[in-house]
Amino acid sequence: MAGGTGSPAAIVLADAAASYGGRPVLTGIDLTVRVGERLALMGRSGAGKSTLIGLIHGQAPDRVALVPQAAALVRPLSVFHNVYMGRLDRRSTLHNLRNLVRPARRDVAAVEDVLGRVGLADQLWAKAGALSGGQQQRVSVARALYNGRPILVGDEPVSALDRQQGGRILAELARSHETLILALHDVALALAHTDRIVVLEAGRIVLDAPSAGLDPARLSPFYEAA
């Protein structure tokens, strides 16, 4: 269910700014995301979406499960171990070291369940580096699902998937997390799977509106130069 104005704030940015190499990347960002919202960040390449994702993650790292733009997998390790990393900080060092050599049955079962939700249960023991780009992206999503924190922040989490498969993954993320904040480039997916769209242009918010009141024609100009 979408978060309303009465829902508590999950993320608050007030006049936030960021620069890279002395060059402003984000300026005057005022953004409040409420518990229960499904928000899409959109805009051309270079508009500042990834930087904003970083600021949002930094606001509440202990409440955020992150799907980074690059899958960031440890390629020589198995899919199991890469997904298991989503909870490393909640397990003892001894348990984590033991799982590296002889994974506990309950952990294997939990990871296998999560992989089933992204269509990769049969890849549990495959090396992450042997997977296709789309499979690696789904492993990254599975790691965030396994992490289980209430706010899911994703930087193009389905960019390597076709629209149908991407839609299924976004629906699974919505079922599994209380609040979604997703940088997306696919207008159709954003309209179908979020309830609010925020568009960035040259580091500023130029549109912030309910998805229900928007359509592809309204959003496509922001992508013409993408």
What spans do the regions from the language model cover?
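Conserved ABC ATPase signature
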Residues: 127-131, 135
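Catalytic Walker B motif of ABC-type/P-loop ATPase nucleotide-binding domains
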Residues: 152-155
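H-loop/switch region of ABC-family ATPase nucleotide-binding domains
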Residues: 184-185
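Conserved ABC ATPase "signature" region
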Residues: 96-123
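Hydrophobic anchor residue at the start of the ABC signature
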Residues: 141
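Conserved structural motif at the start of ABC-family nucleotide-binding domains
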Residues: 11, 26-28
